[in-house]
């Protein structure tokens, strides 16, 4: 420590002496004047070192510690920020994967529902066709029955007409009486 102080003192003296040498010439007493200035300067340096040495040293030591602490805290903050960034990026990747999974699932469900709707529509189509076929068969049967009934009525009318033309009123009365007897016989 003392070696550093001596070195600093010597540098200051050399700087001061070169500054004094650059001045204009004075008459007489040059060495005394120079020695007095050097002694004054040495006393000033001694007082500064004696009274302000420790506070200045402490100030710079504290400043150094503060800077080192700030650097450490900055590095820690940077590491935490990088870690947080990595976590966020990982979460985003997971979210992207989740979104893709949801889209894939929705697409699969949509395809399944489409297939199910097509199958149900095919079943409904077959059911409607079967119902239509049954209705057509029923309508055809009803039409046939109606035609048979009408044909029977026409046949009866034609038969009746032919019978009326061929049968005399006495024969009609006789047939009527026989029919009444047959009907009465069935009732009993």
Curated annotation (Swiss-Prot):
Predominant subcellular localization, coarse grouping: membrane
GO molecular function terms attached to this record: proton-transporting ATP synthase activity, rotational mechanism
Residues passing through the membrane, by range: 5-25
Topological category with respect to the lipid bilayer: Single-pass membrane protein
Gene Ontology cellular-component terms listed: plasma membrane; proton-transporting ATP synthase complex
NCBIfam families associated with the record: ATP_synt_b
PANTHER family: ATP SYNTHASE SUBUNIT B, ATP SYNTHASE SUBUNIT B', CHLOROPLASTIC
Described purpose of this protein according to its UniProt entry: F(1)F(0) ATP synthase produces ATP from ADP in the presence of a proton or sodium gradient. F-type ATPases consist of two structural domains, F(1) containing the extramembraneous catalytic core and F(0) containing the membrane proton channel, linked together by a central stalk and a peripheral stalk. During catalysis, ATP synthesis in the catalytic domain of F(1) is coupled via a rotary mechanism of the central stalk subunits to proton translocation. Component of the F(0) channel, it forms part of the peripheral stalk, linking F(1) to F(0).
Family membership noted in the UniProt record: Belongs to the ATPase B chain family.
Protein name (Swiss-Prot/TrEMBL): ATP synthase subunit b
Organism per entry: Thermodesulfovibrio yellowstonii (strain ATCC 51303 / DSM 11347 / YP87)
Lineage of the organism: Bacteria, Pseudomonadati, Nitrospirota, Thermodesulfovibrionia, Thermodesulfovibrionales
Gene that this sequence comes from: atpF
């Amino acid at each position: 420590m003392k070696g550093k102080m001596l070195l600093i003192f010597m540098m200051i003296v050399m700087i001061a002496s070169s500054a004094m040498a650059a001045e204009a010439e004075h008459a007489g007493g040059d060495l005394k004047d120079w020695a007095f200035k050097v002694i004054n300067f040495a006393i000033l340096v001694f007082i500064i070192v004696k009274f302000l040495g420790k506070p200045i040293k402490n100030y710079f030591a504290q400043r150094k510690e503060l800077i080192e602490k700030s650097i450490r805290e900055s590095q820690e903050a940077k590491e935490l920020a990088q870690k947080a960034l990595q976590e966020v990026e990982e979460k985003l990747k997971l979210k992207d994967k989740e979104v893709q999974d949801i889209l894939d699932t929705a697409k699969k469900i949509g395809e399944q529902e489409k297939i199910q709707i097509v199958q149900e529509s095919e079943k409904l189509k077959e059911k409607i066709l079967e119902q239509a076929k049954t209705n057509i068969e029923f309508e055809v049967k009803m039409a046939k029955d109606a035609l048979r009934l009408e044909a029977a009525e026409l046949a009866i009318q034609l038969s009746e007409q032919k019978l009326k033309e061929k049968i005399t009123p006495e024969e009609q009365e006789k047939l009527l009486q026989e029919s009444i007897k047959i009907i009465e016989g069935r009732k009993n």
